[in-house]
Amino acid sequence: EEHGLNGKTEMWYVLDAEDDAHIILGFNRYVSKAEYIERLATGNLEEVLQKYPVRKGDVYFIPAGMVHSICKGCLIMEVQQASDITYRIYDYNRKDADGNLRELHTELAQKAIDFENWQGRKISLQPAQNGIVNLVQCPYFQVNEMQIDKPKEYDLAPINSFVLLSCVEGHVTLKWDDDYLTLVDGETVMIPAEMNSLYIVPTVNTKLLETYINN
């Protein structure tokens, strides 16, 4: 509202993680706005931040207004609501190349934080249906995990949106008309909404993340 723009609802998919890797998501108990401001001023906000140990394949949903941070040792794919706004409330006193502390947005952030919705959560994955696991379905995007071990027709007609296919394990060849594209681990391709189908050929057991907008 401050800038006349959207909030930033997000989803995190952990691609890889070191043994001691963790994220920060929400608070570890209810924190009032007044307590938040006091802790920020005295430098002990970290005491009430909720830390989650992470491992490869974990999925987290971050609603707009929730305090969050990706910490060291994490390689994460982020899907988010379209927004150009990020409020930084704490930066571990890190400095840029010129020795300056990065800008913080403490006053703006305290207006944006939803202090009533303070508990983050890891998503409990449901059993696969025909090789597809729905990870997140919200008003801003849908993300599915596709497990592919043999060639298959990929029907795009029911999806009234562009589609992002992200290879998170293995690699595949995408074929359509007389053309093809190879997608390897760590790569993403955008499929235009006008395309109705293509053929997916995995070379090894493969996991793809399918992301689109629910229209």
Enumerate the predicted regions with their spans:
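Active-site region of the double-stranded beta-helix
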Residues: 1-56, 71-171, 175-176, 181, ...
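Conserved metal-binding segment of the jelly-roll/cupin
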Residues: 53-72, 81, 183-197
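Sequence termini and other peripheral, non-core segments
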Residues: 186, 199, 208-214
